[in-house]
Amino acid sequence: MAAAHSWVDHFLIAMPSLADPHFFRGVTLVCQHDAEGAMGLVLNHPSDFTMGEVLRQMDIPGAAPALARQPVLLGGPVQRDRGFVLHEDARDFGPSLRFGHGLAISTSREILEALARGDGPADFVMALGYAGWGAGQLEEEIVQNSWLTVPAERAIIFDTPIERRWQAAAGVLGIDISGVSDSVGHA
């Protein structure tokens, strides 16, 4: 059974009042959403790891310096020991969740090896962990004004610097998120 409205391929933009450190000033891409719950990746919280460190830990040699320096994100509080590679869905890299308009999440070693060889997807983001919501939880958080929503834009995912993604996603709505009040509905 599908959810009444699917937020797949949308950004969840954390309101300034959302204090949970996993989502504070966060922009999350919803990758799966149905009646059973939702799954997404936080796109603007860097971890302490780089791609080079992840590849070394997995004994995958040959990463070019630019790839090795690329930051790995904290994708959310669930399964932080597991890597998720968000990329354009141009090739099959083993088990993948395909969603939206040509995006996929792959968790296989194969995609990491392809990236290290230089024949992986040109545009990708790697995250450790993901954000998950139970049945109806995301909808309730949206009703409670924890999130703004907007259709996802590839340029924000792949081309915008990490530290600018929250503002850029809100900018799609034509607002300066830093000027949004933490208090809503009080006269």
Residue ranges and their predicted role:
Residues 1-126, 130-187:
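A short aromatic-anchored loop/beta-hairpin motif
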